[in-house]
Structures are given as C-alpha cells and as structure tokens.
C-alpha cells in the first residue's frame, strides 16, 4: 500500500493528520519489535545541525545507521560555507539536496526548516527543531511513549510543567494530542513562561479542556502523564532566568497520591527540575522515553523514503 508520507516534508506536527501520526506510531512499534537493518540500504541522509544538540542528533544518526543508510553532515555550522563565507540557507539546501535522499535539519531560526523545504526539491526535509517553534520528531517519540505506557492517546490527563513559552516540545505535543479525543491539559508555569496564546486559542476553538495552575501539588492525583521541562537558559535574559529557574522542581515526595499508571516524561536535558530521587520511582520514564526516539525517528525516515512500506 502506498504510504502518504513518501517524500513528504516533516516541518510541523500540524503537517500530519491523526491517521498519519498513527501510521508513524504503528511503524515505530513494528521496528521496535522487529529491527530492519537493511531497510534503507544504499540511502544517504544528511544530518545538518546548525544548533547544539546531543540526544536528537545522536538519536537520528543511530536511527540512520540501524536502518542500513549512510549519514553525512555537520554539527557545527561555523565551519561550513554558510558560517564562514556567508552562503545563504537557500543555496546550502539547494546544494545538499543534490547529494542525499533526505535532510535532517536543526536550526536556531524559527521557520528555517520550512524555508529549506522550498529549496530541497524532491528531497524531504525533517525538522529536528527550529528555534522555539516546532520539534515534530520529539513529539512523535512522546506520543509513542504515551501510547506505550497508557495503551491509548485518547482520554489522557496530561500536565505540562515549567517553560511553556519557549519550549517547542510542549507546543508540538499539545497540537498533536489535540488531534485525539477527550484529552485534558493542565498547564503549570509562571506567568513569564506561560503557554502562548495561540496554543490556548487552538484548544478553545477545538473545545478541548485545559486549565492553568501555579502549583503541581493540586493536580498530581488526576494525571496520567506529567511532562516536565527545563527553563531554557539560552532563550532567556539572565535576570529572567534567575527569577524562574527554580520555581518548579519535581521531587519524589510530590508524587504522593499519584495514580499507579502515572509516568513522568521530560524531553531532556534536565538541569535541576527533576531531582534524582525521582529516578528511582516507578513513575520515572524519561530515559526510556529518550530511547524511544530511535524507533520514532526510524519510522519517520523509513516512511518518507519508501513509496511502499509493509512491516
């Protein structure tokens, strides 16, 4: 059966329908159960990271290797023609697209991946994060993890805690879960880092329930998923960072009264917003969540590069 993601750019989670999201998740589950080490044999994929990354870059490159493809690229754009000689992003993508079958790209500028897609021809761009905007593959692994731990993506009570203003992961995840039914969002953040108005407006237009809170304690007993985020020092001025960095810290004692099925997730890296004593609780699932990135990203790459995919 021809798959709808073949040669499709993956720029925003909003570019994917519920059916397409479920296709990626089914493919990820199949690849987790049964590895396919030659599925992308002879394919070449560019890994173009214009912004620092550890987990996302290594996860993508591991995914590429485990599917049998080759990877080329860079993790320091200062040593590229774009960084040293002033080449435009459009020209850079126009050239790289002649070398490879797909391009995985992270960039600090919002909208950079969508711009790149205008110049990559038939070569799909996979957005690995563009500024504070979108991080669709993190969302796919988040969805995969929620489904794996809860057995569903409908009727989920999820709290998002911390930096909801600049945290692209929570923007994308909220938009994705809004495609499913009966979910309730609890947004817990200081005013300076509140969820953007456009996200709240989207939920209101879809008549999806959400509530705003200043305390984690009052909502823990209601939750299926507790999604923690770090305060992003690199996106704040020093005075703002100092004011909010320690406002929301999760300790094991905060999980008293939690549901048995509760899982604590975090896109990582964590700084001090989850204390290490939480790691030892049955609720901690953030390291397994990171590991699921391999399967979600394998699934996405397999789908954008295969006209037909039957696993």
UniProtKB/Swiss-Prot annotation:
GO-annotated molecular function: amino acid binding; aspartate carbamoyltransferase activity
Entry's Gene Ontology BP terms: 'de novo' pyrimidine nucleobase biosynthetic process; 'de novo' UMP biosynthetic process; amino acid metabolic process
First-level EC class: transferase
Disulphide bonds in the chain: none
Enzyme Commission (EC) number: 2.1.3.2
Pfam families xref list: OTCace, OTCace_N
UniProt keyword list: Pyrimidine biosynthesis, Transferase
Catalytic reaction annotation: carbamoyl phosphate + L-aspartate = N-carbamoyl-L-aspartate + phosphate + H(+)
Record's subunit section: Heterododecamer (2C3:3R2) of six catalytic PyrB chains organized as two trimers (C3), and six regulatory PyrI chains organized as three dimers (R2).
Similarity comment text for this entry: Belongs to the aspartate/ornithine carbamoyltransferase superfamily. ATCase family.
Protein's recorded name: Aspartate carbamoyltransferase catalytic subunit
Annotated source species: Yersinia pseudotuberculosis serotype IB (strain PB1/+)
Taxonomic placement: Bacteria, Pseudomonadati, Pseudomonadota, Gammaproteobacteria, Enterobacterales
Gene that this sequence comes from: pyrB
């Amino acid at each position: 059966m021809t798959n709808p993601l073949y040669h499709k750019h993956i720029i925003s989670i909003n570019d994917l329908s519920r059916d397409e999201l479920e296709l990626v998740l089914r493919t990820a589950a199949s690849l987790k159960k049964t590895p396919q080490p030659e599925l992308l044999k002879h394919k070449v994929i560019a890994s173009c990271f214009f912004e620092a990354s550890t987990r996302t870059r290594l996860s993508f490159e591991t995914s590429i290797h485990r599917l049998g493809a080759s990877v080329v690229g860079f993790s320091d754009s200062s040593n590229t023609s774009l960084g040293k000689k002033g080449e435009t992003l459009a020209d850079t993508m126009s050239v790289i697209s002649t070398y490879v079958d797909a391009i995985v790209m992270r960039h600090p500028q919002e909208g950079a991946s969508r711009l790149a897609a205008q110049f990559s021809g038939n070569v799909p761009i996979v957005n690995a994060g563009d500024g504070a905007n979108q991080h669709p593959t993190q969302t796919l692994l988040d969805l995969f993890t929620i489904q794996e731990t809860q057995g569903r993506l409908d009727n989920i009570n999820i709290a998002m805690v911390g930096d909801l203003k600049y945290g692209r992961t929570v923007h994308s995840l909220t938009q994705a879960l809004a495609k499913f039914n009966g979910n309730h969002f609890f947004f817990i953040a200081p005013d300076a880092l509140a969820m953007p108005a456009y996200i709240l407006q989207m939920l209101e237009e879809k008549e999806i329930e959400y509530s705003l809170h200043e305390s984690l304690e009052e909502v823990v007993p209601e939750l299926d998923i507790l999604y923690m985020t770090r305060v992003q020092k690199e996106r704040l001025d020093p005075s703002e960072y100092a004011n909010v960095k320690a406002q929301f810290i999760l300790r094991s004692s905060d999980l008293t009264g939690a549901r048995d099925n509760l899982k604590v997730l975090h896109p990582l890296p964590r700084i001090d917003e989850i204390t290490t004593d939480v790691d030892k609780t049955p609720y901690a699932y953030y390291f397994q969540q990171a590991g699921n990135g391999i399967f979600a990203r394998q699934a996405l790459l397999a789908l954008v590069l295969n006209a037909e995919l039957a696993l």
